[in-house]
Amino acid sequence: MRIEMKNISKAFNGNPVLKNAQFMIETGEVHALMGENGAGKSTLMKILTGVYKRDGGTITIDGQERTFKNAKEAEEYGIAFIHQELNILPNLTVAENMFLGKELMYGKTGILRTRQMNAIAQQQLAELGLHVKGAMLAGELSVGQQQIIEIAKALMTNASVIIMDEPTAALTDREIETLFTVINKLRKEGVSFVYISHRMEEIFSICDAITILRDGEYVGKRSIPETSFDEVVSMMVGRSIGERYPERNSQIGDVIFEMRNGTKKGKFENVSFQVRKGEILGVAGLMGAGRTDIMKAIFGYEPLDSGQIFINGQEVKIDSPIDAIRQRIAFITEDRKSEGLVLDFSIRENLALPNLESLSKGSVLSNELEQQFTADMMKLLNVKASSGEQAVKSLSGGNQQKVVIAKWLGIHPQLLILDEPTRGVDVGAKKEIYSIMNKLTEEGDAVIMVSSELPEVLGMSDRVLVIHEGKVGGILEKDEASQESIMALATGGE
């Protein structure tokens, strides 16, 4: 299937989000759609699949002009959209998820052909390299396995084009390899993929071509062999952003935080490490190794069962997030939408949440202080929004992440914990987040950064703490750290 979108325009409430956008994909092609958050990538694909009606432009499929009334019609025609938030019902079986809305029945009796559906589901998944039983509950599978189920569902509707939005955001390295194997198998069979992602290494590994949007407009198309990381970044942001990771200039000082023999039953045991003033400590390890559990313990979200925590040399008890905040410890969680933000609240309301005491006069929240704090933080972090009253759910991923960071900067943290700080964030916003981390450490504060992106860990960390199966695999100085040395420790080697 060959799709061509020309001069596509779309506005919401008079605000243009797409202006003469273009996109073209060939049969059997894996085509990346890139741009900063808010560039219009998802909107363009929603227009293709009938979720939104375009204001102008044309869509041709195999030479014939087409318009879909809704996503179901697009799916029936062979175009499937797998969203970042997977459409899997955890309490249904694998087969029930795959046959949802198209169940096999005995005539008109309403009785399901459960055994037949289970067998077909197992066979379809086995062809994609996933060997699970159709009768298993989908909620028992990993996110990577659920993603393969989504692809299998699309293929059951005879999809010729599969759109994937941030497909690897929550996958382990092994699951990413499995996904790429499936994509490579299907592209040989003529299936095309639109691959929306910010992960440059993956795009250069799996894709054939890249189309770039900026501020809702078509910037250009490049074939992978003919372009470079720097050119793509420059096209996305409209300027050269210089070095990928900003230079570190902070002075490393005394120990600000220490954990000794920290243990949480079933999660991690005997974890000991230090963080110093002015330092960024990177934390690496495989998914499920216990990295996030350790951070939750530091923040008092899931307190230690045993072990000690010291702040500036003094032992402290952290049994709740309130205890952590009193010690000026801030935690920016990996799941900003469900744990970091109240999506229906405005930017102002989200920023106020951990800062109610400092924004109050007496015991009454001061509107004046709140408004000033919101304006200051939006300016400091370059949050792109119409005003502080805009609902955070309407912001791009990068701007949502900036709001999460901004609300915690209000407590003037001496230790800032960032868990996957740039997941789902575009290149320009990543650079701004890195600059915030550097600014904090230059002022003598400390940062712990948990990341699954090894180039990010290597580019930003002064030292790297590697966690393996709930234990400290090792701690690497900057000059010792490499992708190979980190992975060796993360997998139990030396």
From Swiss-Prot:
GO cellular component, one term: plasma membrane
Keywords linked to the UniProt accession: ATP-binding, Cell membrane, Membrane, Nucleotide-binding, Repeat, Sugar transport, Translocase, Transport
Protein name: Ribose import ATP-binding protein RbsA
Annotated source species: Bacillus anthracis
Summary of subunit composition and partner proteins: The complex is composed of an ATP-binding protein (RbsA), two transmembrane proteins (RbsC) and a solute-binding protein (RbsB).
Location of the protein in the cell: Cell membrane
An MF annotation (GO) of this entry: ATP hydrolysis activity
Record bears the keyword Membrane: yes
Function according to Swiss-Prot or TrEMBL: Part of the ABC transporter complex RbsABC involved in ribose import. Responsible for energy coupling to the transport system.
Residues annotated for ATP binding in this entry: 35-42
Topology versus the membrane: Peripheral membrane protein
Source organism, top-level taxon: Bacteria
Family to which the UniProt record says this protein belongs: Belongs to the ABC transporter superfamily. Ribose importer (TC 3.A.1.2.1) family.
CDD domains with a match to the protein in the record: ABC_Carb_Monos_I, ABC_Carb_Monos_II
Catalysed reaction, written as an equation: D-ribose(out) + ATP + H2O = D-ribose(in) + ADP + phosphate + H(+)
SMART domains: AAA
